[in-house]
Amino acid sequence: MAANYLHGVETIEKETGSRPVKVVKSAVIGLIGTAPIGPVNTPVQSLSDVDAAQFGPQLAGFTIPQALDAVYDYGSGTVIVINVLDPAVHKSNAANEPVTFDAATGRAKLAHPAAANLVLKNDSGGTTYAEGTDYAVDLINGVITRIKTGTIPPGATAAKATYDYADPTKVTAADIIGAVNAAGMRTGMKALKDTYNLYGYFSKILIAPAYCTQNSVSVELEAMAVQLGAIAYIDAPIGTTLAQALAGRGPAGTINFNTSSDRVRLCYPHVKVYDTATNAERLEPLSSRAAGLRARVDLDKGYWWSSSNQQLVGVTGVERPLSAMIDDPQSDVNMLNEQGITTVFSSYGSGLRLWGNRTAAWPTVTHMRNFENVRRTGDVINESLRYFSQQFVDAPIDQGLIDSLVESVNGFGRKLIGDGALLGFKAWFDPARNPKEELAAGHLLINYKYTVPPPLERLTYETEITSEYLLTLKGGN
């Protein structure tokens, strides 16, 4: 405000007109699971496979390293990782486990990786070997190496090992779901609520590989997706048949697919990937690969693109064969899509492709928001505008404020139309929806509407066999 009296010159800075809207991040995966090492019940930002290394190697039973490998097969991506395995709690003990050092390599392997508190004795138990003097140990992978200058005899020497090891079978659905502990700290998936204050964004794609097949976990993932404006990717259990997957959409089903939420994407079946540790194929949840693909499509094409009909990376096959023909409504993949289940299309020359555009809202909800890309585009628009509008909160309600808001929002819409994210957009101030009583209470309402381009899910050619072009025939000279 200007001074009452000034013998001189002053400048008063004013802010008027529209302001740009910052788009929120969409390609962020929230991963809840188990790792052999790494922070416990803490949301950790992972931006690459280098960051992923802090959660250890891919070991049987641990879900986080496998899921991170699936995501980073698509390149870089942002993953918020919550490891719920606490080695001080989720542990078992191996007592006097027989181990034998290989005569050629001088190495012995424990039956369980992610070990701790190792005590190694000779076969009779009379001599305790010293780490660093007699042997070196890789506790993560469970490999003991004989030191040549130590007291462990060379050759195929037998020994006995007693140790604790991180046991993922001790992790329960309650651990994955999480809670607020006595110290007021969130654990499990509930810690996803803390990420905005930590990193400035929320996860928009939620996965809990292996654990999401439990109905108790899947319903909590759905609830978290609603709170965060995200989509939860949920798998059917390993071994689920096609008939069981379809039946699971109803109340008589025996699996976790009975939902009509537009915050859930149902994934079936599991996929096969190559396991370097065993030199063989193993099954992996489709949700991990689908989440990595979704993030990649967001970055390469845009969040308004469907991730369906895109190549799955790192996948060698599917758990069970599914018939897939582009023109057969009775094919297995089409029947799954018809019931709102995302699957894998594998036909001659097609490769392995993610197949399915719709969330679990289909077929109950016929509004176009049952398309995942439509739902997610709406989420990005709505959240971006909410965060952008903070700068206007508590400003005086006047015509300048209303004009700035409407023009800013319309400018955002024009940008999205130019990007190809929208077909149309309009924001406006409606005096009839803003009575003086509401304005007097400090409440202002701005309307906006938009249209997201739906994916081309069904293409129909209408053809006619006609004789009319016979008239183009001409006689010779």
Curated annotation (Swiss-Prot):
A Pfam match is Phage_sheath_1
Could you list this entry's UniProt keywords, alphabetically sorted: Host cytoplasm, Viral contractile tail ejection system, Viral genome ejection through host cell envelope, Viral penetration into host cytoplasm, Viral tail protein, Viral tail sheath protein, Virion, Virus entry into host cell
Record protein name field: Tail sheath protein
Q: Superkingdom of the source?
A: Viruses
Write out the function statement from the record: Polymerizes as an extended structure around the baseplate-tail tube complex. During ejection, the sheath shifts to a contracted form, thereby making the inner tail tube protrude through the host cell envelope.
GO biological-process terms attached to the record:
symbiont genome ejection through host cell envelope, contractile tail mechanism
Q: Where this protein primarily resides, as one coarse class?
A: virion
Q: Where in the cell is it found?
A: Virion; Host cytoplasm
Source species, please? Burkholderia phage BcepMu (isolate -/United States/Summer/2002) (Bacteriophage BcepMu)
Q: Assembly and partners?
A: Homomultimer.
The similarity comment for this entry is:
Belongs to the myoviridae tail sheath protein family.
Return the GO cellular component terms, semicolon-separated: host cell cytoplasm; virus tail, sheath
Specify whether ATP-binding is a keyword of the entry: no
UniProt key word Repressor: no
